[in-house]
C-alpha cells in the first residue's frame, strides 16, 4: 500500500484509524503482526498478550521464519488426490474363483493348500 491509500478513509462499514507511526510498535508486551491477503497487508497491534509460535500453512524462508511461524512447513493447500487403494475382497466366492484359477495354472497335481487370511483395516 502506498501512503495515499493508507490516508484515505475506507467505506462506512469499517473503522478508520490513521497510522500513528511508520515504524512497527514492538515492546515486550506489545506485538505488531502483519498479514498479507491477496496483495493487501493487514497490520494488527496486539498489546498485553503472550508470545506463541504458530505453524503456518506455507513454508517460510529463514529470514521470515520469525514473523511467519516455523520454517519448512509443508504447503497443505496443494493436496494431491490419493490414488485409489486396492482392496482385497473377503468374499468366499471370489476366493474360490481365484483358487480355481490358481489350480489350473499350477502343473503339480497335488499341492497342499494353505489358508489365506483377509484382514480388514
UniProtKB/Swiss-Prot annotation:
Residues 1-28, 57-95 are annotated as: Disordered. Belongs to the gyrovirus apoptin family. May act as transcriptional regulator. Induces apoptosis in infected cells. Element of infectious replication cycle. Keywords: Apoptosis, Early protein, Host nucleus, Host-virus interaction, Inhibition of host mitotic exit by virus, Modulation of host cell cycle by virus. GO terms for cellular component: host cell nucleus. Its main location: host cell. This is Apoptin. InterPro entries: CAV_VP3 (IPR006858). Residues 58-70 have a biased composition (Polar residues). Induction: VP1 and VP2 are detected 12 hours post infection, while VP3 only after 24 hours. GO terms for biological process: symbiont-mediated activation of host apoptosis; symbiont-mediated perturbation of host exit from mitosis. It is found in: Host nucleus. It holds the Pfam family CAV_VP3.
